[in-house]
Amino acid sequence: MRDWRFIFEKYLLRKHPPLEPQVWTELSRIRGGLFVDVGAYLGTYSVRLSPHFRHVYAFEPNPSAVPLLRKRIEERSRRNITVFPIALSDSNGLARFYLDAHQGFNGSADTLLQVFKYNPGRQIGAGPAHTYVGKECVMVPIATYDSQIQEAADLVKIDVEGAEFQVLKGASGALDEGRIRRIMVELHDKDAKDDLYKILSRYGFKLKQLDPHPRIFGSLA
């Protein structure tokens, strides 16, 4: 995706910080059998939380990031992490995956969406909402959550650069059956917050804001 403003803000001005102390405080209390990391990227969440779970499923479709993710897992001897080099979405098959043009950052802003609105809220120093239009893309395998995971998950984290609702649609079976105990979603458009709350409240989740920007919402109790 050719959006140098996003790259400049995220990595140089730190306006889009990937980690939040408040989030880690919440997550560090959780223990369980399975953590599903949707949009694992280089494995920050997967690796850091892996000691708290028997199994971690890390979903990452970026063909440049996957080898680095596997290397990081190997270097830290995290044998309970399984990497799935596919994108979770609302269907099964192949799809265009639009690339972050700044290869030096290994595509942290890659997305299944060709048009991606970034409007996360009151981030410190952030300018007005802006939209990215994908130019370069690769074909990647996609699948629904329901087609990939049958067991119950103690925690599901979703960070997929605007494609959050496609992932949730593809997980409707697991949500219906109560096979997702806790969920955390990084929402990239604050105008969609009410939709997120509405969808997840149907399944009994009581979401709360987990960071001060706001962009991360979850039900972690």
What residue spans do the PLM features occupy?
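Phosphate/nucleotide-binding beta-alpha loop and adjacent structural elements of enzyme active sites
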Residues: M1-A221
